[in-house]
Amino acid sequence: MKNIFIINGGQTFAHSGGTFNKTITNWTKDVLESENFEIRISNVNDDFDANQEAENFKWADVVVYHFPVWWFQVPNRLKFYIDEVFTAGHNNGIYKSDGRSRVNPAINYGTGGLMHGKHYFVTTSWNAPETAFTLEGEFFNQHSVDEGVLFGFHRMNAFTGMKSLGSFHFHDMEKQATQERIDNYEIEYKNYLKNALRNVNAEVLN
């Protein structure tokens, strides 16, 4: 495993400048360069060729997504990017079909992906504090990010055949974005990413 494709979904929109996700992208790049991975990076704010982006998915051993959560969904530019690129990847390395046959269409939905053997990793950034997910009576009713807001996102990647390499979530990045917290997050995130990459390398070697 050596090829890593990073997608910076930190869209510039309204009061959001995408600055923090650019920072996370640079942290990821630092880790990958120190481990001698081959890297490609796309930014959803840039114009793109959907066919070339589909080639990036096909080239990658691991796809890394970085994005803020807006209104409990991915930013609109990232959704547009995924729609365009995954359509370009139909019968072209990303997915073939929904996996079902007309003989028994009740079963095997979601098994038509073409990216088996590949992994993905995701980070999200939030205004919401972590306690909004963990404390009884708080907004997300004790549903985690991955089991709640990102459930569909994870299923999307599973549809292509990719396996999750893990996720890391940055909370309270509006009201509590102190330099100390950001510095601590950098250390924690880089260690988490290094361990995740070691785990997938061990899986590949086995």
Question: Whereabouts are the PLM-identified features?
Answer:
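A short, charged/proline- and glycine-enriched loop
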Residues: 1-2, 117
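N-terminal beta1-alpha1 ligand-phosphate binding loop
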Residues: 2-35, 188
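A short, flexible beta-alpha/helix-coil linker loop
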Residues: 10-14, 127-136, 172-175
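Glycine-rich phosphate/pyrophosphate-binding loop and the adjoining helix
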Residues: 21, 139-206
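A structural motif corresponding to the C-terminal end of an alpha-helix
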Residues: 31-37, 112, 118, 156-165
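A short beta-strand-loop structural module common to alpha/beta enzyme folds
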Residues: 35-48, 168-171
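Acidic-and-aromatic substrate-binding clefts and catalytic sites of carbohydrate-active enzymes
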Residues: 46-52, 72, 174-177
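Helix-loop-strand module that forms the ligand-binding subsite of alpha/beta enzymes
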Residues: 51-153
